[in-house]
Amino acid sequence: DNQGRTFVTGVIEGAPAHAVGVLVGDEIVSADNRPFRPVGSFRGKVGSPVSLEIRRASGAAPITISVSPADLHPNEMFLRGLKESARIIVTDKARIGYVHVWSYASRRIQSALEDLMTDGPLKDADALVWDLRGGWGGAQPQYLDLFNPRAPTMQVTGRNGETGFVDVKWRKPVAMLINEGTRSGKEVLAYGFKEYRLGELIGHRTEGAVLAATAFLTGDDGLLLLAVEDVLVDGQRLEGVGVTPTIEVPFDWRYAAGGDPQLDRAVQVLARA
């Protein structure tokens, strides 16, 4: 933040931080008794425990958490995060499904999402919270067709008896979560979701970072993203503009202790749907 403190803004399900109980909003004070540096504090320590001092409330004494960094492939990490995020939130009025799509950089992500809806924990939900906050982009506009109720879904069975679904469609209420970490192809999905009134868009305006880019290593441990293609969506420019939600919900994640007012609002809206 503007005071030089480091806060956790997202915890990917199934990753080492999630496994040891790190929460959104935690301030990371130190690592192995040294001031915390993102990436640098974990460099060369894969598989070895690192002692993190975490402050969970403003002015509170830090607590110590031991975490072992892992060598993770991003697409595998995001795929596992997607699957492990899927759950049912039970309310007095409805069973609300929840899933967090951290990245669409692999086609396997969309297939896994469809499987969660047809054969996984989301299949019996009355409504769905589709969380696109944080992570990477990579989404294609046609992924929105998953929420097009006017197209058919096919169920096919092979000679071996195995059954699968083709062109899966979600025909129940859905809300999308967005924030300033929603970028690139996810912003295209957010635009279409809002423009075609597929459901409520809840949270904060997206980043406005839509241009296609190529990454270059700079030689000093840096990474330069250089725009290589202009992008218009339905003739409109989202770059530098972003997509605004239909329901604005502020979220100051500092010392949130895992609380999530944007998700809480989405559940409230869908429970009334």
Where are these regions (language model features)?
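Cleft-lining beta-strand/loop regions that shape enzyme active-site pockets
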Residues: 10, 35, 40-219, 255, ...
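Low-complexity, Gly/Ser/Thr/Pro-rich intrinsically disordered linker/tail segments
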Residues: 253-273
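C-terminal structured "cap/appendage" subdomains that terminate the fold
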Residues: 215-240, 245-246
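Short conserved micro-motifs at the rims of enzyme active sites and ligand-binding pockets
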Residues: 110, 187-188, 236-242, 259
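Hydrophobic residues embedded in beta-strands of well-ordered beta-sheets
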Residues: 6, 95-97, 224
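PDZ/PDZ-like domain segments forming the peptide/carboxylate-binding groove
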Residues: 1-37, 229
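Generic structural signal for buried aliphatic residues
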Residues: 28-29, 50, 238
